[in-house]
Design a protein with these regions (language model features):
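Generic enzyme active-site microenvironment
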Residues: 217, 308, 390, 451-452
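Thiamine diphosphate
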Residues: 98, 106-119, 278, 327, ...
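Short acidic loop-to-helix transition motifs that present clustered carboxylates
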Residues: 31, 51-56, 78, 396-398, ...
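Active-site diphosphate/adenylate-binding microenvironment
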Residues: 8-11, 16-18, 26-36, 350-441
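Active-site phosphate/pyrophosphate- and oxyanion-stabilizing loops and adjacent acidic/basic residues
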Residues: 59, 126-127, 232, 377, ...
């Protein structure tokens, strides 16, 4: 092996070392020479129709694979992707954004170059990126470039957030020492010092042993912090009643007998919220306390009775214990925990059992219209172990909270960024990562299944072309309710601005060049207006197999929406109008008073 290699070869081989196998992006004159290094480094080039979709797809890939990379060109390219990168920051997806930039001498000379603002300032876009990434590097110095790359990649993986790397065109072929590649980047999660966590472990265990009515809530950052297995084991071993948030759905095994669906606060089961408020111990893992994820802030537990696990600190009874890494802390708790001392508490079935509710549903009539009220439960019979299930922002993400998931499934939704159109390109990235990992024996066999609204699909429809180009297996249920239904419920039920142009959705695969009658990549398209039609479609072997591109258009009425959505939008409307200002509470106000004031 040569003693020195080109800087871009070093960069791409590092990406391969940390587990990335494919690169998303769009070619541009500032990154073209860099793209020549992708295949020699053992990476695949995806090639997206636009940069926004490339960013969304990289995010979806990262949520399955753990980390991803997207390449754009300076200025016009990177700004097209910035919405996606901001979403990755907000929801903690590890995306490496590589930007091909103008040569260093051009930048230093303030030359009026294309794709710039024409003012000679080549730093403005990097300054924007710094607000939505956890680490940045401008690879200008050959002596420090490799260390800068390693620093950014390490930060991306360990902090579960995007990073930004600038690669000037005149640095692409700069020679750097090859031997650095022999030492892998340390991506291990930090361990707590021996004995350092003992006090906190004992404090937590004693609270668990003495509790009379315990409750576990698993939230979405649990997976980002790398503690999904520990959370699942805690749920299984304790037998404590467990729920998830919307963002946390699918992280723990939902077939456990002590799993009671989603805790929806003021928008959910009327008996669940009073019961949860009466718990003397709430263990919350990986919290994201956004308005959407907490149902208008109504599910945030009282700090005095809570143990909350963050990435590198824990809150016990409202007291913050710093520099405690949750993975190490949870492993110690699980190792030391005496299950015989735990309370043997069995909650009432009134708290909800999704599987029992699904089994109790009476079969619909053949000619009955497909409805939001039961669709999400009934469609759960279509799922199997290993599936990746994705629900787009809107009625699909809210309805998807009622899905009944088998073991070993993954559910992807958005619970703070909520950029409609995200899920279609994200499904491309997720399906690609799934295919890679199944081939490596790292995932169960399964399908990628997307529930996409008609309005959302129109935002990012070119992603269908990317799916077809890469021959990915994706099953898409297009929920056609003739416009922006969630916006109608928030404001403007009959307003024209919530209407969209009707499309012939099932003709999209043909328009985007999908093959016809190719057994290696089958294309399946069907339309359902009634339950009889939908059930017949769901039973078709081609759809069950999930190979190739499958599109099922599901017709629903324009104003039909999940009941929980109708409850949520009432508080959203009041908050948006200014009727609900964040309260100035006295120190004597109870936690419940504070929460309900905020929630409205």
């Amino acid at each position: 092996m040569a003693t020195h290699i080109d800087l871009t070869e070093f960069l791409f081989r590092r990406l391969r070392q940390i587990g990335i196998k494919a690169i998303h992006g769009v070619p541009g004159d500032y990154n073209l020479t860099a793209l020549d290094y992708i295949e020699p480094a053992g990476l695949d080039w995806v090639g997206n129709a636009n940069e926004l979709n490339a960013g969304y797809a990289a995010d979806g890939y990262a949520r399955i694979r753990g980390v991803s990379a997207v390449i754009t060109a300076f200025g016009v390219g990177e700004l097209s992707a910035i919405n996606a990168i901001a979403g990755s920051y907000a929801e903690r997806a590890s995306v490496i954004h590589i930007v091909g930039t103008a040569p260093t001498h051009v930048q230093d000379g303030g030359v009026c170059m294309h794709h710039s603002l024409g003012d000679g300032n080549f730093r403005i876009f990097a300054e924007m990126a710094a607000k939505i990434t956890v680490a940045q590097a401008n690879l200008r110095n050959p002596d420090t470039a490799t260390a800068e790359i390693d620093r950014c990649l390490q930060a991306c993986v360990l902090q579960s957030r995007p990073v930004y790397i600038e690669l000037p065109t005149n640095m692409v072929k700069v020679r750097v020492p090859a031997a650095i590649l022999d030492k892998p980047i340390d991506l291990s999660l930090p361990e707590n010092d021996e004995g350092f966590e003992d006090t906190e472990v004992d404090l937590i265990l004693n609270k668990m042993y003495s509790s009379k009515q315990p409750f576990i809530v698993v939230d979405g950052f649990t997976s980002r912090y790398g503690i999904g297995e520990e959370a699942d084991e805690l749920v299984r071993l304790t037998g404590f009643p467990t729920s998830t948030t919307p963002f946390g759905k699918g992280i723990v095994n939902e077939t456990y007998p002590n799993f009671h669906g989603m805790y929806a606060g003021m928008a959910g089961n009327l008996k669940y919220m009073p019961w949860a408020r009466g718990c003397d111990l709430v263990i919350k893992i990986g919290p994201l306390d956004s308005d959407v994820n907490t149902f208008g802030f109504s599910t945030i537990p009282d700090p005095k009775s809570s143990i909350v696990f963050h990435r590198d600190y824990v809150e016990i009874g409202g007291v913050k214990y710093e520099n405690l890494h949750s993975k190490s802390l949870l492993r110690k708790i699980l190792t030391k925990m005496d299950t015989d001392r735990l309370p043997k508490y069995k909650p009432s079935m009134d708290l909800g059992n999704l599987r029992a509710q699904l089994q109790a549903l009476l079969p619909p009539g053949e000619d009955d219209q497909i409805d939001q009220a039961t669709f999400w439960q009934r469609i759960s019979n279509f799922f199997r172990e290993g599936d990746i299930i994705m629900t787009e922002t809107g009625t699909t993400s809210v309805g998807g909270r009622d899905l009944v998931l088998p073991a070993h499934t993954t559910l992807i939704n958005s619970s703070i960024w909520l950029s409609i159109g995200y899920m279609l390109p994200a499904s491309q990235g997720a399906a690609l990562a799934q295919r890679e990992m199944i081939a490596e024996g790292k995932r169960h066999q399964g399908r990628t299944i997307l529930f996409e609204g008609d309005g959302s699909l129109q935002m990012t429809a070119q992603a269908l072309s990317d799916i077809i180009r890469n021959r990915l297996d994706v099953t898409i249920f297009v929920i056609n309710n003739d416009g922006y239904t969630i916006e109608r419920w928030i404001h403007g039920m009959k307003a024209g601005y919530n209407d969209i142009q009707p499309w012939r959705y099932l003709e999209a695969p043909s328009y985007f060049g999908a093959p016809k009658d190719d057994p290696a990549y089958p294309v399946f398209t069907k339309r359902a207006e009634t339950w009889g039609q939908l059930n017949a479609i769901l039973a078709e072997p081609a759809l069950q197999a999930g190979k190739g591109l499958n599109m099922v258009e599901v017709i629903m009425t324009q104003e039909d929406a999940p009941e929980v959505l109708k409850k949520l939008v009432q508080s959203t409307s009041r908050r948006n109008s200014g009727e609900m200002e964040r309260p100035k509470m006295s120190g004597t106000a109870s936690h419940e008073e504070k929460v309900m004031k905020i929630a409205g």
